[in-house]
UniProtKB/Swiss-Prot annotation:
Residues 23-45 are annotated as: Framework-1. GO terms for cellular component: blood microparticle; extracellular region; immunoglobulin complex; plasma membrane. Disulfide bonds join C45-C110. Residues 1-22 form the signal peptide. Pfam families: V-set (PF07686). Keywords: Adaptive immunity, Bence-Jones protein, Cell membrane, Disulfide bond, Immunity, Immunoglobulin, Immunoglobulin domain, Membrane, Secreted, Signal. This is Immunoglobulin kappa variable 1-33. It is found in: Secreted; Cell membrane. Immunoglobulins are composed of two identical heavy chains and two identical light chains; disulfide-linked. InterPro entries: Ig-like_dom, Ig-like_dom_sf, Ig-like_fold, Ig_sub, Ig_V-set, IgV_Light_Chain. Its main location: secreted.
Amino acid sequence: MDMRVPAQLLGLLLLWLSGARCDIQMTQSPSSLSASVGDRVTITCQASQDISNYLNWYQQKPGKAPKLLIYDASNLETGVPSRFSGSGSGTDFTFTISSLQPEDIATYYCQQYDNLP
């Protein structure tokens, strides 16, 4: 009995299952911004497909390791000031600094972990 066809079908099925959630693209905006102390700052992040709430927000200062600020889209990491907040689910997420402080000057970025390489 020739088993090549079922094996090929199984391979296609596994490929389809494993590929269903790969290559999630994240689009963050704005790419840069100018703001003053005391300003409310908002950054958005959009996923190319539904990632539920599997999103982190990080702060990185020059020469330093990234610091986790927000996990699961909206949960504040212990010790992070309450002026930082996150919201959203599915494909659209928002990160907010309610009142910008001088020490907040940094690079901020989102990271999805619904599907990791």
